Amino acid sequence: MRVILLGPPGAGKGTQAVKIAKEFDIPHISTGDIFRQNLRDNTDLGKLAKEYMDKGLLVPDEVTNKIVEDRLEKDDCQKGFLLDGYPRNVAQAEELDRFLHDKGIHLDCVLNIEVDREALIERITGRRVCPNCGATYHIKTSPPAVDNVCDKCGAQLIQRSDDKLESVVKRLEVYESQTKPLIEYYTKKNTLVNIDGNKSVEEVFEDIKKALGDRGK
């Protein structure tokens, strides 16, 4: 099973990615993770990416593409993979298509988790994190026993700068501008399946399993 997972910040992609990878026994390939791995291992591609990142520049598509393609060449991807965070634009999608075509591999499904904008904002701005032990909370769905105090270590909880309203609105705008053309691209290729992410985690996962089961037939 070869799958791409799309969805805005706050859609629960990370949670679903772990479940999909386990259910279908395929590696979860997060571009953030493989970038960090290349930086840690000080690979040539990692060094190249770091040059751009140190200057505050976006890493060019050709570098990102190569980092992802190197990961897809590994043995654990022979029977499938789940791509999370890539492609981010149509140019990357076209390069991925070319790469897979050259390998004689086809993409089974592109899952697009959709969540109402208001719900996304509530999910993200409600997050609270313990700066001491890393525990995470949500002021509505999983609050601490005492307001703003970590249950585990007693430290004051914080709201990450990325989770503040202004930052969330900007992140959603960037995602929408980048992803709308991608959604159109995969719709034309008849590989896109929209998933209602407003449901519970388990309900969303059941819908994903059904979609992937139908595609795998």
UniProtKB/Swiss-Prot annotation:
PROSITE patterns: ADENYLATE_KINASE. Signal peptide: none annotated. GO terms for molecular function: adenylate kinase activity; ATP binding; zinc ion binding. GO terms for cellular component: cytoplasm. It catalyses: AMP + ATP = 2 ADP. AMP binds at T31, R36, L57, L58, V59, G85, Y86, P87, R88, Q92, R160, R171. CDD domains: ADK. InterPro entries: Adenyl_kin_sub (IPR006259), Adenylat/UMP-CMP_kin (IPR000850), Adenylat_kinase_CS (IPR033690), Adenylate_kinase_lid-dom (IPR007862), P-loop_NTPase (IPR027417). Keywords: ATP-binding, Cytoplasm, Kinase, Metal-binding, Nucleotide biosynthesis, Nucleotide-binding, Transferase, Zinc. Residues 126-163 are annotated as: LID. Consists of three domains, a large central CORE domain and two small peripheral domains, NMPbind and LID, which undergo movements during catalysis. The LID domain closes over the site of phosphoryl transfer upon ATP binding. Assembling and dissambling the active center during each catalytic cycle provides an effective means to prevent ATP hydrolysis. Some bacteria have evolved a zinc-coordinating structure that stabilizes the LID domain. Belongs to the adenylate kinase family. Monomer. This is Adenylate kinase. The gene is adk.
